[in-house]
């Protein structure tokens, strides 16, 4: 069985993948995993550190062949506002609930949640069911750089710390003079195969 121990970002010049693997957004945060390719082959992904992969990123097999990561279609909501200001307000409400969101110029895309749909419609949004690949924005605390996930979060250390209930600390920058604990309303599973 071939192994993968390195990767290249999407759009790398002169890259011609010979295989593909489709993964939904929540399965694209990887370090070590047996991957089932679209052509029926299997490869063992074995990276030094966890990586949050995006659509089009490339895995490099031990033999030099490339495997393209494709974002799988998912059941989503497409959210549109009356105008850009309204769309920004809707984005604020979604962010306040810590929801993964793909934010585009004229729409926001989220995973389907009928409670959230009711809230958005109550705020005047148009909400449509769609099925397409999902590439949510990477959170400020959960992706430092294009492909890393710093478990220690040392890059944040600017003082004025507050604690979250999901296993690691985050800190605020200068001018934020408070400490607090709060529940995100969701869980992060930092176990890696």
From Swiss-Prot:
Family, per entry: Belongs to the UreE family.
GO MF, any single term: nickel cation binding
Annotated function: Involved in urease metallocenter assembly. Binds nickel. Probably functions as a nickel donor during metallocenter assembly.
Record-linked Pfam families: UreE_C, UreE_N
UniProt cross-references to InterPro entries, sorted A to Z: UreE, UreE_C_dom, UreE_N, UreE_N_sf
Signal sequence interval, chain numbering: none
Record key words, sorted: Chaperone, Cytoplasm, Nickel
Protein's UniProt name: Urease accessory protein UreE
Record flagged with keyword Cytoplasm: yes
Region (Disordered): 138-193
GO biological process: protein folding; protein-containing complex assembly; urea metabolic process
Cellular component per GO, a single term: cytoplasm
Species assigned in the record: Rhizobium leguminosarum bv. trifolii (strain WSM2304)
Subcellular location(s) of the protein: Cytoplasm
Composition skew (Basic and acidic residues), residue ranges: 147-193
Keyword Chaperone carried by entry: yes
Main location: cytoplasm
